[in-house]
């Protein structure tokens, strides 16, 4: 899977710099993304959990999407998660228009969802999204789990469903996600969301890591990638 996914490797979920007045610091973001680019990571994730996406207004998130894409030549993915599906689609449309390689989407958070509801939700999105997309599995924050079987079903149905960030503190869960999705899609990227699971992810045939630590020391994970 690792060799066949265009999104394999070391990802950084970028921080979102703010000024002393609590406004987005675009110059600071530009400098930060420049450093990540020079460190030769593979993919930048904009507005992930560590990027504090839930703290911003829709207008601020659209501004970030529009402005950040030109700050790096690396592959970039925008997290467009929201409890409002129309906002998800609006941000996704802006991301595709701005040149992002994909978008990432959490299940509706706050409302705990059943497997049937999750399948329906992502099917609706899959039918409306015009580009590649990732699911973001973070049960500790959403109150629901995207199971390997559910994800494999969606991967088989939607070619533009490019992969998943599996932020579950259980390596066997991610291993099962890798094995189950691989049975239906060799190009499907399963990425771990915990720093310490990078090498176990690769050993299991996964696509890599989305590590917040890369904001501070991206060279560490790049060197691990090169050594593997």
What kind of region is each of these model predictions?
Residues 127-128, 140-228:
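Catalytic alpha/beta core domains of metabolic enzymes, predominantly
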